[in-house]
Amino acid sequence: MSREKITVVVPVRKGSQRVKNKNFKPFADSNLLKIKLDVLKQVDVIDEIVVNTDSNIAMEIADEYDVSKCIREDYYASSECNNSEFFQNIAENTDTDYIIYSPCTAPLIKVDTYYDFINRFRNAKDRCDSLTTVTDVKQHLWLDGKPMNYKPSDS
């Protein structure tokens, strides 16, 4: 029985809205995309790395790193496309059993973290079909002028 295929999709949008060309700006003697690919190439249980992009620069970097490319259609790179449509498009255009979505805007994820995540998923596949990362927040949170996770009168 063969092992199920794991593909990492690294989304890279040409038209960054808040910080122009953020994925290619100098960062730690490299750039965000190269840092992400450097880490992912060290994780030997990943079967394929796909740079999903509308950027010629990202495609050149994908070639430099010998990883796959998926040319993103303009609509899916626009701010008009919602997250549900975007993720559906990735799923429909990625030939794999499992997708790890790993934006290059999270450059500090370590090799060991990917191994840990993949192992946790493999060990939980009978109970779940996806995993996501979360952060334990131990602060009082407010939304629209109202407390979300506590009662001020009890504090």
Language-model-detected regions and their locations in the chain:
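Short, polar loop motifs at secondary-structure junctions
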Residues: 53-58, 136-138
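Short phosphate-binding loop-to-helix
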Residues: 56-100, 108, 112-116
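Conserved core of the sugar-phosphate nucleotidyltransferase
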Residues: 85-86, 98, 107-155
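N-terminal glycine-rich phosphate-binding loop and ensuing alpha1 helix
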Residues: 3-52
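Short helix-capping segments at alpha-helix termini
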Residues: 41-45, 95, 123-125
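Histidine-centered beta-alpha loop that forms part of the nucleotide-sugar donor binding/catalytic region
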Residues: 13, 74, 103, 135-136
